[in-house]
Structures are given as C-alpha cells and as structure tokens.
Amino acid sequence: MLTIADTTFSSHLIMGTGGATSHEALERALVASGTELTTVAMRRHAGTRGGESIFDLLRRLDIAPLPNTAGCRTAREAVLTARMAREALGTTWVKVEVIADEHTLLPDVVETLDATELLAAEGFTVLAYTSDDPVAAQRLEDAGAAAVMPLGAPIGTGLGILNPHNLELICSRASVPVLVDAGIGTASDAALAMELGCSGVLLASAVNRCQNPEAMATAMRHAVEAGRLARSAGRIPEREHAQASSTFEGLASWADQVL
C-alpha cells in the first residue's frame, strides 16, 4: 500500500496524462496500469472528446485526479494554479512543479520551496517535484510537503535514473513518501526506482509516447511491483570476488572410480 497524507492507494504507480495521443489510448493505458492517481496539468485543462473531458474520464474510471502546476515559473503562479484547481475540482491535492526554464525543464528548487510552504500552510496536500538533491528534498519535507518527487532524469528524456546514489539517500532520510518523477524510459527504470527505496513512481511520457501505450503501462505496473518486492526481499550484498552457491565438499574424484 502507498499512503500519502491520510489517503492509501493499493497501486504504487502514478500516471500522467501528458503526451497521450487520444482519449482512447489514454483510457486503455490507465486501465492497464492499475493506477488510482493521475496527474493533469491545469493550464491545459486537457481538452474534450465528444463532450468528455479528461476529468470526466478519470471520474468514470474511478481514478483520483492530481492537479499539476506544470509550466509555472514562479511560486506565485504555482499557488494561484493550485487555488484554481481547488475551486474547479474540489480537491486540496496538488503536484507542485515550478520549472527554471523551458529548455531543461529542471525544477526551480527555491520557487518550489516557497510554493510548498505557502500551500501547505493553506491546508493543501503538496506533492513537490524537485531535483535529486537530498538537501532540497529534506527542505521540502520540512516545509510541509506530503511527498517529495525527485527526478530520475530531465522530463521527457527517458534517460532513467541518472543518480541512483542520491535517490537512495533521499529515500533513506525521508519520513514522507518519495516518488520518483520524470526521466523514466522503460520498465527496468521503474523497477530500479522501487529497488532503491522509492515509495512509488510517477510517469507519463514513457507510456503515452511509446509505440504501444497499453502494453507499456502493463509492463510498468508489473515492474513497479517487482521492484517493490525485490526491495522488501532484501537483495544479496554486492561482492568483489566470486562466491560459489554450492560447496566443493563431496565432489567426485578419480579415487572414487573403479578402474
């Protein structure tokens, strides 16, 4: 189970709606993923198909929407977007994403920290997108973030987990859920994130922009679960030298043979 604030989810996979080619493809992917929480960028408001908005789609699939402040460049913009989402959707949950520039799409940690502090004080449940800096993650937790979301790699790159050491360090120090966000390219990346100690994985492009979103969503669902189980099972320690899995005692020798 994944518990964020006072809400528990059975799935550790959070999906995003960005990059989906159609409502039909998105719906198939969401169902295949088993997700119960999905981000929606409020600035796009997702559009409609035959009168059905993405919010209608999520409601029909019984998936909770997670408003996202994607595209915001300042704490002020993020706070305003979160308040608009609260009014429009009746939710106090928000993924705070404040980017530094449109080329790297890397998070502006200073503005993110300010937005998190302001929104948490207003009673929002803040899931904060941040860098893979352990100090930044700790500052966001101290500011009231209900979950910290360090990137695996820049948004949309599909480069996977570029700094596994830092990600594992963030997980070991955090007392709130750590959800890796951005950079996931394929199922093995999602499994690794969970093996490093993450509580969950958020992804969008890896599924919505691949050749077969439904199949990849299925793969991601299994990968997240496999990584979580592997982490809880306790992997063997890494060794510099080989260690036989069977002893050499009782091996047959020429002395045992009848010539």
Swiss-Prot record:
The gene is thiG. GO terms for biological process: thiamine diphosphate biosynthetic process. GO terms for molecular function: thiazole synthase activity. Transmembrane segments: none annotated. The active site is at K95 (schiff-base intermediate with dxp). Its main location: cytoplasm. It is found in: Cytoplasm. It comes from the Bacteria. Homotetramer. Forms heterodimers with either ThiH or ThiS. Coiled coil: none annotated. CDD domains: ThiG. Belongs to the ThiG family. The keyword Transferase applies. This is Thiazole synthase. 1-deoxy-D-xylulose 5-phosphate binds at G156, A182, G183, A204, S205. Pfam families: ThiG (PF05690). It comes from Corynebacterium aurimucosum (strain ATCC 700975 / DSM 44827 / CIP 107346 / CN-1). SUPFAM superfamilies: ThiG-like. It catalyses: [ThiS sulfur-carrier protein]-C-terminal-Gly-aminoethanethioate + 2-iminoacetate + 1-deoxy-D-xylulose 5-phosphate = [ThiS sulfur-carrier protein]-C-terminal Gly-Gly + 2-[(2R,5Z)-2-carboxy-4-methylthiazol-5(2H)-ylidene]ethyl phosphate + 2 H2O + H(+). Its EC number is 2.8.1.10. Catalyzes the rearrangement of 1-deoxy-D-xylulose 5-phosphate (DXP) to produce the thiazole phosphate moiety of thiamine. Sulfur is provided by the thiocarboxylate moiety of the carrier protein ThiS. In vitro, sulfur can be provided by H(2)S. The lineage of its organism: Bacteria, Bacillati, Actinomycetota, Actinomycetes, Mycobacteriales. Keywords: Cytoplasm, Schiff base, Thiamine biosynthesis, Transferase. GO terms for cellular component: cytoplasm. InterPro entries: Aldolase_TIM, Thiazole_synthase_ThiG, ThiG. It is an enzyme of class 2 (transferase). Pathway: Cofactor biosynthesis; thiamine diphosphate biosynthesis.
